[in-house]
Amino acid sequence: MGDLLDWIISFLFLATLIIIVIYQLTCLADLEFDRINPYDVSSRINRMVLPEFGLQGLLCLYYILTGHWFMAVLSLPHLFYNIRLYMKREHLADVTELYNTNKWEQKKRVYKIGHIALSIFITTYWLIHSALGDI
């Protein structure tokens, strides 16, 4: 039963994480089609960056504490990438450069969504496996 609860909590972490990244991607798409101005886009994205980074760090720590080593190793590249962005101070969207870097910012978030989706599929598998094992 404990393993099932671990996977449910992990799934909730990942679902929240993918919602945050999809929200950022939607904001960038709105900028691309001129539905919103760059100042609003950058303030919306910048508001979500630190919660995304913190949630990814908590998820990696949660995997380590619960002993899910494969998932911890799988989430490390995403965590290290976020740490590298933060250390280089490239984690926030710049209002003046947002039009020029819009495609790159979208591409980064699409890769993040792919990585999170892979983690969700693996977590769902183990969630179902744990649920059926408890019967």
From Swiss-Prot:
Protein name, per record: Protein cornichon homolog 5
Q: Which superkingdom?
A: Eukaryota
> One biological-process term from Gene Ontology?
vesicle-mediated transport
What family does this chain come from, according to its entry?
Answer: Belongs to the cornichon family.
Localisation? Membrane
Which InterPro entries does the entry link to? Cornichon
Bilayer-crossing residues are 8-28, 57-77, 113-133
SMART domains, A to Z: Cornichon
Q: Which cysteines are joined by disulfide bonds?
A: none
What membrane topology does this protein have? Multi-pass membrane protein
To which species is this protein native?
Answer: Arabidopsis thaliana (Mouse-ear cress)
Q: Which UniProt keywords apply?
A: Membrane, Transmembrane, Transmembrane helix
> What are its GO cellular component terms?
membrane
Query: Entry's Pfam families?
Result: Cornichon
User: Does the keyword field hold DNA repair?
Assistant: no
